[in-house]
Amino acid sequence: MDRYPDLNPDAGELETAEVVVTDDVLVKAFALGPGAEMEPHDHPDATNVFHVTEGTVTVLQDDEEARVTAPGVVLHERGRAHGARNDGDETAVLTASLCPLPGGG
């Protein structure tokens, strides 16, 4: 029943895995090695929620950024640019929940 993936990125690398995929929701895991970044992007028709599960990430949202340490939750409203960066020395992990899926329910 546990779908949490085993991700182990090197420094500067970002590893991802789809954890849950249904007709109306996507949960994806992101493991950021030290120095890695998830480039800012947006989802015009979907809400995105980050759940920081391990370590500390710098969350980027439009022109703002904030350090979020596990356990932490960050809401990204529809159409709001968002991303994440690992400024630390250890791997950081977050999941991102996206719903509804673009073109989905």
Question: Each predicted region: which residue ranges?
Answer:
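A short, N-terminal "cap"/entry segment at the start of jelly-roll beta-barrel domains
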Residues: 1-28, 39, 74, 105
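Short histidine-centered beta-strand/loop micro-motifs
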Residues: 17-19, 29-30, 38-43, 61, ...
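Short, charged/polar surface micro-motifs in flexible loops or helix N-caps
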Residues: 23-25, 34-36, 54-56, 65, ...
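A generic "binding-loop/recognition-motif" signal
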Residues: 25, 34, 45, 64, ...
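Short, surface-exposed secondary-structure edge patches
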Residues: 29, 49, 64-66
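Short, conserved beta-strand element in jelly-roll/cupin
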Residues: 31-33, 44-59, 97
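Short acidic-glycine-tyrosine-enriched beta hairpin
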Residues: 63-79
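Ligand-binding loop in jelly-roll beta-barrel domains
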Residues: 78-104
